[in-house]
Amino acid sequence: MRNQRRTVVAAQPVEYVEPRRRYIPYPAAPIVGAVAGVSGVLVIISTFFSWISGSGVTGWSMMSKGGFGTSQNFLFSTGGSRIVFSGFWSLLFGVLIVAGAVTLITGWGGANGLVLTAGILGLIISVLSIVMIYTLKLQSLTPGAGLWMFAVFSLIAAVAGGVGQSQMEYMAEG
């Protein structure tokens, strides 16, 4: 047998490192994030509900098959100097609202501006579509539940983003 040499290294003292706590931009950020997240999910779900009652048209069918009028694409339908936006916009703004909400809940940073902007743009597009449907003056065609959901939950997301932005500015001052 051969002699084996063993080298023994003295243990170095271990320095305790406190775990990094996640950054919460303001105390109500998880609540604002949760409200915005639920609103964003409901904006996405609104795509699959009826957008024009009496016709069976959903936001998804407007995007995938075309809506009504003389000109249709996956973004909007036009006809008679009126425009109705498709479900693409509710999907886009819903995803942006949810992304902003996730950053607020997880503490990665304050995405209040993203939630606020997506909520406002979603509200503008949904209200514009609602107004355009009402101007058709056809008793059988009215805005459906999906379009109303898109408007209401975009408004809620915009308010949540606005409250969050206000809280961020308040925390920065004090």
List the predicted regions and their residue ranges.
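Compact integral membrane and secretory-pathway proteins
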Residues: 2-174
